[in-house]
Regions:
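C-terminal accessory/connector segments of nucleic-acid motor ATPases
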Residues: 1-6, 15-19
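Rhodanese-like catalytic fold shared by cysteine-dependent sulfurtransferases
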Residues: 16-198
Length: 198
């Protein structure tokens, strides 16, 4: 695969709604449409990592510039023809399942596994009972408490960080992660799921 080379990563910067329905196996999602720069730094960590971009037409220049601003100058370039070309050539693709807040509400009493990837301060203001908590910046290194054979509903505050987390977990062999669309904001506004307080 493209990312088997030592110290190389496939970084997909498209919108998460497009990413989840098809992406190159082992790629990491960090979309240009969200908090791109801080999460590149927090998630990729190693500024010497070689980066191959997957982007929409016209996004490459902006992505390379924004990577460079936070010290990631080792961009190998972007995939010619983008994801569409990759898929149309018959190469393997992955997907990530998603559920909206109302769908989560239907399953909430079925003993499902919920993973909260928000910061500690956000969680202190309210969280879902029995949810596990691993802040996004730690998901790559601190996932020992998770079980690869289980399905996890992953949420953040608004739905951007959770997709980053799902892509990292997928690369690590967690094949049943479900992204909760709209995150905790949507859960607290659109459902009657009980919110716990510390």
């Amino acid at each position: 695969s493209l990312s088997t080379q030592e110290n190389t990563i496939i970084l997909d910067v498209r919108n998460q709604d497009v990413f989840k329905i098809g992406f190159i196996p082992d790629s990491i999602f960090i979309g240009l449409n969200g908090g791109f720069a801080p999460w590149v730094g927090a998630v990729l960590k190693d500024i010497n990592i070689k980066i191959l971009l997957v982007c929409e037409d016209g996004q490459a220049k902006e992505a390379i510039m924004r990577l460079s601003r936070v010290g990631f100058d080792n961009c190998l370039g972007y995939l010619e023809g983008g994801f569409r070309m990759w898929k149309n050539s018959g190469n393997p693709i992955n997907t990530i399942g998603s559920a909206n807040a109302k769908e989560l509400e239907k399953f909430i009493n079925n003993n499902i596994n919920i993973l909260d990837v928000r910061q500690v301060g956000e969680r202190n203001n309210g969280y879902l009972k029995n949810s596990e908590h691993i802040p996004l910046a730690l998901i790559d290194s601190e996932n020992k408490s998770l079980n690869k054979s289980l399905k996890y509903y992953v949420h953040c505050a608004g739905g951007y960080r959770s997709m980053i987390a799902c892509s990292i977990l997928k690369k690590k062999g967690f094949n049943a992660t479900i992204d909760v669309e709209g995150g905790f904001g949507s859960i607290s506004n659109n459902t009657s799921i009980e919110i716990s307080q510390n």
